[in-house]
């Protein structure tokens, strides 16, 4: 028996059973879920779908393109861990990558980009003490440019804490089982606070259970 998306097997509105009055149709088929796992052994399958179109079914992934909205920067980075999923805790336990899953990504590419753009190495010292690196001698023109950029520079304190730990919380915005990629965005502001509270609550519950 294949997976079918028809309504013939459902009961009537009155609650009575309905007889199968025709066979299954190709256009009503369903496929097994991808359940994309977090793994370094990247596996993506090509699937021919209706109309001769193509879907890319990611079975194992560990990298993705993540954008940092407030800085208008996108970097390819490693996904390190699945931290939270609003729909199902089982998906966190099994490290499954789905749309809207909250994951921890490697902060290094963003750190590097920030250093290049502002000349500031974030996440080095304690909160609020960003260090300006003086290792490479810069020309006056470059120094003036960096100073101009620093005037409008603002960094969320929560984000700075995460940069010190080397892991950033991010949300997956693509559908790995449909397009074969796990792309998303770095959490900031109110959204970041919301998910940090959720994770803290979860940690507290686990500690209580233990």
From Swiss-Prot:
Disulfide bonds: none annotated. Residues 1-22 are annotated as: Disordered. GO terms for molecular function: structural constituent of ribosome. GO terms for cellular component: cytosolic ribosome; cytosolic small ribosomal subunit. GO terms for biological process: translation. Residues 8-22 have a biased composition (Basic residues). Gene3D superfamilies: 3.10.290.70, Ribosomal protein S8e, subdomain. Keywords: Ribonucleoprotein, Ribosomal protein. It comes from the Eukaryota. The keyword Ribonucleoprotein applies. Pfam families: Ribosomal_S8e (PF01201). Belongs to the eukaryotic ribosomal protein eS8 family. PANTHER family: 40S RIBOSOMAL PROTEIN S8. This is Small ribosomal subunit protein eS8y.
């Amino acid at each position: 028996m294949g997976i079918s998306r028809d309504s013939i097997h459902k009961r009537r509105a009155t609650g009575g059973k309905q007889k199968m009055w025709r066979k299954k149709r190709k256009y009503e088929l369903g496929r097994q879920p991808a359940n994309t796992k977090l793994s370094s052994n990247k596996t993506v399958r090509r699937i021919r779908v209706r109309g001769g179109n193509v879907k890319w079914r990611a079975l194992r992934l560990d990298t993705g393109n993540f954008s940092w909205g407030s800085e208008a920067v996108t970097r390819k980075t490693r996904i390190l861990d699945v931290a939270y999923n609003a729909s199902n805790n089982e998906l966190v336990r099994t490290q499954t990558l789905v749309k809207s899953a909250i994951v921890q990504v490697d902060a290094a590419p963003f750190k590097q980009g920030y250093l290049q753009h502002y000349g500031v190495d974030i996440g080095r010292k304690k909160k609020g003490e960003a260090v300006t690196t003086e290792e490479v001698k810069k020309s006056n023109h470059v120094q003036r440019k960096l100073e101009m950029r620093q005037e409008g520079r603002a960094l969320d304190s929560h984000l700075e804490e995460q940069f010190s730990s080397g892991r950033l919380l991010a949300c997956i915005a693509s559908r790995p089982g449909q397009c074969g990629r796990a792309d998303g965005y770095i959490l900031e502001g109110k959204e970041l606070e919301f998910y940090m509270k959720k994770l803290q609550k979860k940690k507290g519950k686990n500690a209580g259970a233990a």
